[in-house]
């Protein structure tokens, strides 16, 4: 994260973190200018991000009790490992994928197992299942995947969940979910109603352009949500971050503009 620098070079363009070049919504900028970053700085943030969870539940038609707020989706990914893994367990993830997955494995003392990919750098149900052992506790699947841009269809995800032992947690990392415009793609929220071992993660860092404020969240069954809350710190997201995230959610016109622009650029 942050700015990149190369000795002797100026104005380096940093691409490695996939930051939103549009920046945040104009409404977010206006709110920040009006209130300033020290708005209510003497007050602790809400422990559970109640207002943000309620806004997320309304927009996505979800149960707010099953939403857990994190310091970026990175933290919610870590929550899963802290809650369900220990030394000697195995975590499965793609060979070419988000670098947080092997970092998280090291944090909890687990072993990373890499999913074999095809010639297009895509994983499939069979290649995932081939890595499963009695020691497997979590499978992290960025869907769509970072950095390859490949994705698993709703049918593939369902086939995988049906074939897996029910004690294995499948974390569907939807950091780039809003960008996908495909009929066979599903962001995964509906899967929570069908399978008890699914966690869906989302972030405000990408399409919403709020990477510096570190806000993310996850959605799961009530049982899993209660377990995740046990490993979450009480004040893990800033007050201003929660409030600005709500403003960003309300600016649908800007969100659609960013998505449309990304879609058009892909056709170049």
How should these model regions be labeled?
Residues 123-134, 147-170, 174-207:
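Active-site pre-lysine segment of PLP-dependent enzymes
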Residues 15, 139, 173-175, 201, ...:
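Structural scaffold positions in well-ordered secondary structure
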């Amino acid at each position: 994260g942050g700015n990149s620098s190369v000795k002797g070079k100026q104005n380096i363009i940093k691409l490695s973190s996939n930051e939103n070049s549009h920046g945040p919504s104009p409404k977010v900028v206006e709110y920040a200018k009006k209130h300033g970053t020290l708005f209510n700085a003497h007050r602790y943030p809400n422990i559970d991000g109640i207002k943000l969870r309620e806004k997320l539940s309304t927009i996505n038609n979800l149960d707010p009790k099953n939403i857990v707020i994190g310091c970026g989706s990175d933290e919610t990914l870590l929550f899963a490992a802290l809650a369900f893994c220990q030394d000697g367990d195995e975590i499965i993830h793609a060979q070419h994928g988000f670098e947080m997955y092997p970092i998280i494995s090291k944090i909890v003392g687990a072993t990373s197992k890499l999913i074999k990919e095809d010639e297009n750098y895509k994983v499939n149900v069979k290649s995932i299942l081939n890595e499963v052992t009695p020691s497997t506790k979590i499978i992290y699947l960025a869907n769509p995947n970072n950095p390859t841009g490949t994705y698993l269809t709703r049918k593939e995800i369902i086939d995988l969940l049906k074939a897996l032992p029910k004690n294995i947690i499948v974390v569907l990392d939807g950091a780039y979910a809003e960008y996908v415009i495909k009929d066979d793609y599903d962001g995964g929220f509906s899967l929570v109603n069908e399978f008890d071992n699914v966690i869906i993660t989302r972030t405000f860092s990408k399409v919403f352009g709020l990477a510096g404020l570190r806000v993310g969240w996850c959605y799961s069954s009530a049982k899993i949500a209660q377990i995740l809350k046990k490993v979450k710190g009480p004040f893990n997201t800033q007050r201003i971050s929660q409030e600005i995230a709500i403003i960003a959610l309300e600016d649908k016109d800007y969100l659609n503009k960013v998505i449309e622009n990304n879609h058009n650029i892909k056709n170049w």
